[in-house]
Amino acid sequence: MNIDKALNVEELRGRFLKHTRLAYRRLPLLEQPRILEIGCGPGQQTIELARLSGGEVVGIDTDPSAVSRLQKRIDQANAGDRIKVIHVSLFDNKFDDDCFDIIWEEGVFHLLDASKCFVECRRLLKPNGYLVMHETILWLESTKIRLPDFGFKLMDEHILPKHSWWTDYGAPLKDRIKAYRDEHGNASNSKKLSQYESVVASIESDPDRSDCGIYLVRRMDGYGQK
């Protein structure tokens, strides 16, 4: 059984699209921008970014199943002229220098080498382009001081309501997992379900650590670089 579908995890993640919209509206008005989404997954944000921007969105992800799901969405929406998805990592891409107006990531950079991420994003962004990062506030604050070293300047931020990831994601997911186990008994045991239980336990144990924000930083040529 597809655990994601059984738990309707996509609906829970979709609750955070409102923050994607609010953050996007803080950007300056760009006419049909070219956007790169890093770690696009099955594409909820990808589709939303295409709708918000009216431009072209390229999603990249290292998970082939997520790429396949997004490609199916693109085909169903007949949106292949504006949305593309590629199975590749940020560090193995073949994109030209200075080719994106906006780079967007949600919950990816904290899993990677931040320095390498910033170097590659600077290469890919056009001059004065924007990098938008949705991460925990703890990660963002600890990383903010390093932004000038890579030629980036923090321009704006959108802070999510306190404990949003518990209220809108962890708590309802915990209830859905319990209901699923109650219904299916021993047959409910699966690696994916256990992974979700670990995520829920992590958020529940310290909701403050999961509080998130979205930083909008700009490539500034000659600004603060070492």
Where is each model-derived feature located?
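Class I SAM-dependent methyltransferase Rossmann-like catalytic core
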Residues: N2-R15
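Conserved alpha-helix/loop element of class I SAM-dependent methyltransferases that forms part
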Residues: R13-E31
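Conserved class I S-adenosyl-L-methionine
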Residues: Q32-G41
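Class I SAM-dependent methyltransferase SAM/SAH-binding core
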Residues: P42-F91
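A short acidic, Gly/Pro-enriched loop at the edge of an enzyme's catalytic core
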Residues: F91-I103
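A short SAM/SAH-binding and catalytic strip from SAM-dependent methyltransferases
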Residues: I102-A114
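A short glycine-rich, Lys/Arg-flanked "PGG" loop and its adjoining helix->strand segment in the class I
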Residues: S115-Y130
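Conserved Class I S-adenosyl-L-methionine
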Residues: L160-K226
